[in-house]
């Protein structure tokens, strides 16, 4: 297994750690609940950066594989959708927005599975990558939940939802 594929798998492995730090407020080894959110943010940022890094490495060193073309967008969907569902639990995003995003992601994943069953691997498009970046930035802003950034957060979140449609 090559490095880009390992980074993609690493991104998926980080998801449960991200969720625990985001949603479990009273960890005895942390001074306060805010620490958990900041650690969750750091994990999410690292996972998001692996998304950018795995693709760059794969293209630069000609390490593109069918596994990577299929799993990389799926890992992104798992990361973003898990984060959005957790953020509903924290009351930071309306459930309807998450439903719109997840419905679209499931639909696209379904198309990918049908294509894969027929021996065709569909790589992520430019617009899909662009949408994912906006979703990831929106998630980061929703995690930190800084009141001064509320308007910016809402703007980026709306752009992410519109790009999703």
Q: What are the roles of these predicted feature ranges?
A:
Residues 1-165:
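Alpha-helical transmembrane bundles and membrane-interface segments of multipass inner-membrane proteins
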């Amino acid at each position: 297994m090559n490095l880009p594929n390992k980074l993609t798998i690493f991104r998926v492995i980080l998801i449960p750690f991200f969720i625990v730090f985001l949603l479990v407020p009273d960890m005895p080894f942390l001074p306060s609940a805010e620490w958990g959110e900041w650690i969750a943010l750091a994990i999410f940022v690292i996972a998001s950066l692996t998304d950018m890094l795995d693709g760059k490495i794969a293209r630069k060193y000609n390490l593109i594989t069918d596994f990577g073309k299929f799993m990389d967008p799926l890992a992104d969907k798992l990361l973003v959708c898990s984060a959005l569902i957790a953020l509903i639990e924290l009351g930071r995003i309306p459930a309807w927005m998450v439903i719109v995003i997840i419905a679209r992601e499931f639909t696209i994943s379904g198309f990918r599975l049908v294509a894969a069953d027929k021996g065709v691997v569909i790589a992520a498009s430019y617009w899909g990558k662009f949408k994912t970046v906006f979703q990831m930035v929106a998630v980061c802003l929703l995690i930190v939940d800084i009141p001064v950034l509320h308007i910016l957060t809402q703007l980026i979140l709306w752009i992410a939802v519109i790009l999703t449609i």
